[in-house]
Curated annotation (Swiss-Prot):
Membrane-traversing stretches: none
Protein name, entry field: Probable chemoreceptor glutamine deamidase CheD
Function field: Probably deamidates glutamine residues to glutamate on methyl-accepting chemotaxis receptors (MCPs), playing an important role in chemotaxis.
GO molecular function term, any single one: protein-glutamine glutaminase activity
Gene3D superfamilies in alphabetical order: 3.30.1330.200
E.C. number(s) listed in UniProt: 3.5.1.44
Keywords: Chemotaxis, Hydrolase
């Protein structure tokens, strides 16, 4: 399910919110995808030469013993995202991925977030897809803005919906990995308002 809205930053840009269990892909430079993550993981993927990209939002790595083709599960969500990009003209060998989410949000969710993060990284390694940036783990929710044709990502941490004691999220970026922007958002901030970019 997708929610659409017009960006307040640029009326020419269409913002599409990606819900849990969904994926989208596009070659339209006027589209920006957003999603909010807790224990879920999203894969932002782009072919920077063909200028096509897409994003998914999955809840669990696997469906268990039964293989169910459902976008809530990482193995299917990443596979279908790759296929959708290839249909738009991407070259599999040029695909670049960025991973976000996988937080430990509540005790009830246990190791769901870390399991999602481990799965996504292993899947990309096994498929020989270059993971150029990642921000995984921690205890805070994240809001992501992804520009599919450039691969540019903005990330904002949402402290107002924390459910566990604060802890610095584990963030790892490769040198020269492309552009990822990080923001902190306190309890009095508007989660939809992204501040100045930090480089």
């Amino acid at each position: 399910m997708l929610d659409r809205e017009t960006s307040r930053d640029d009326v020419a840009v269409q913002t599409i919110h990606v819900m849990q269990g969904a994926y989208v892909a596009s070659d339209d430079p006027n589209i920006v995808y957003t999603t909010i993550l807790g224990s879920c993981v999203c894969t932002c993927m782009c072919d920077p030469i063909a200028r096509v990209g897409g994003i998914n939002h999955f809840l669990l790595p696997y469906a268990g013993v039964t293989k169910v083709e459902n976008l809530r599960y990482g193995y299917h969500a990443i596979e279908i995202l790759i296929n959708s990009l290839l249909k738009l003209g991407a070259n599999r060998h040029r695909l670049e991925a960025k991973l976000f989410g996988g937080g430990s949000m509540t005790l009830q969710l246990g190791a769901v977030g870390p399991a999602n993060a481990v799965f996504a990284q292993k899947y990309l390694r096994d498929e020989s897809i270059n993971c150029v940036a990642r921000s995984l783990g921690g205890t805070r929710a994240r809001k992501i803005r992804f520009h599919p044709t450039s691969g540019r990502v903005q990330q904002m941490f949402l402290t107002e919906i924390e459910q566990l004691p604060p802890e610095s999220p584990r963030v790892r970026l490769r040198r020269g990995a492309g552009e990822v922007t990080y923001f902190d958002c306190d309890a009095n901030s508007d989660p939809a308002a992204f501040g100045k970019e930090m480089r």
